């Protein structure tokens, strides 16, 4: 599968070079420094954004017992902050012609959001989760439009459409990578983290008594393997467990989620360093 991907990528690049100005993704654009920086930033921010948007609702469903619909509605602070900051930053850029300060602030805010999420516990209050959501929405509102502006800033007018489509393409690809990578990290770690906590909890007599009750034993059927492992194909069993029995499962899930968000913070930090130290502090012309 990886070999097919590499061959496809190489073939695509060679074909695009051959097509020159008629290419879907003109290779000549990558000679422009601002465009290169824009694609890298869109890719890294896409990883963080889509990775967080994929895994945060899982936290709300598992740790807070929300339905998928309620979990989606609970993320409204992200959208509210996004829309507000997008409008404000757009006006400020139009007035001053400066975009770097908003870009750096946006990527920094997104990184702070990941760090807030990385400190979540299964009993964290919703207002604390909402703080992270506001940072994330504000960061995306400030970063997305300024990254696009950066990528367009040195591109000739005739290539503006191709440049805009290209940076959005890289953001989408970053999102695909982020969602896949974050979920892979989550489910590769969750099993072992849960097993460790269940093993510790099983040393307590009250936990063994609760787990042995008919309703809990039925819910755990097929979840706990004889070798001590855990099957995580479906987390719906948590809704049928006594809270005392569900606790080690929730702690294991959230522990794995914290690693996911720390990974997102690391990617966000890379984007922040690029934005702060590589992006020039230029002023856009009125044209």
Question: What residue spans do the PLM features occupy?
Answer:
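Hydrophobic alpha-helical transmembrane segments
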Residues: 15-24, 78-85, 196-218
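Transmembrane-helix exit segments and adjacent C-terminal regions of multi-pass membrane proteins
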Residues: 14, 214-287
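Transmembrane core module of solute transporters
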Residues: 1-2, 7-162, 265, 286-287
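Small-residue-rich alpha-helical segments with characteristic i,i+4
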Residues: 52, 75, 129-215, 276
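Extracellular/lumenal inter-transmembrane loop segments of multi-pass membrane transporters
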Residues: 62, 94-95, 117-128, 158, ...
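Loop-to-transmembrane-helix entry motif
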Residues: 33, 37, 99, 170-176, ...
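Membrane-embedded alpha-helical segments of multi-pass transporters/permeases
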Residues: 10-14, 115-119, 184, 188, ...
């Amino acid at each position: 599968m990886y070999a097919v991907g590499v061959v496809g990528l190489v073939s695509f690049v060679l074909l695009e070079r051959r097509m020159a100005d008629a290419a879907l993704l003109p290779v000549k654009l990558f000679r422009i420094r601002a465009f290169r920086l824009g694609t890298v930033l869109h890719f890294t921010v896409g990883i963080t954004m889509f990775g967080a948007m994929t895994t945060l609702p899982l936290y709300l469903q598992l740790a807070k017992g929300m339905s998928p619909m309620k979990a989606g509605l609970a993320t409204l602070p992200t959208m509210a902050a996004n829309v507000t900051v997008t409008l404000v930053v757009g006006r400020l850029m139009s007035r001053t012609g400066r975009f770097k300060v908003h870009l750096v602030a946006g990527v920094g805010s997104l990184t702070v959001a990941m760090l807030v999420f990385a400190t979540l516990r299964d009993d964290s209050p919703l207002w604390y989760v909402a703080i992270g959501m506001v940072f994330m929405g504000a960061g995306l509102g400030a970063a997305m439009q300024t990254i696009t502006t950066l990528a367009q800033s040195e591109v000739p007018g005739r290539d503006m459409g191709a440049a805009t489509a290209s940076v959005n393409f890289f953001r989408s690809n970053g999102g695909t990578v982020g969602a896949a990578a974050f979920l892979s990290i989550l489910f590769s770690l969750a099993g072992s983290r849960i097993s460790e906590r269940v093993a510790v909890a099983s040393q307590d007599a009250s936990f063994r008594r609760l787990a042995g009750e008919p309703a809990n034993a039925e819910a755990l059927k097929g979840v706990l393997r004889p070798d001590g492992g855990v099957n995580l194909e479906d987390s719906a069993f948590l809704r049928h467990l006594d809270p005392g029995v569900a606790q080690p499962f929730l702690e294991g899930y959230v522990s794995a989620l914290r690693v996911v968000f720390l990974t997102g913070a690391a990617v966000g930090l890379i984007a922040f360093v690029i934005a702060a130290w590589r992006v020039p502090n230029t002023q856009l012309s009125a044209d």
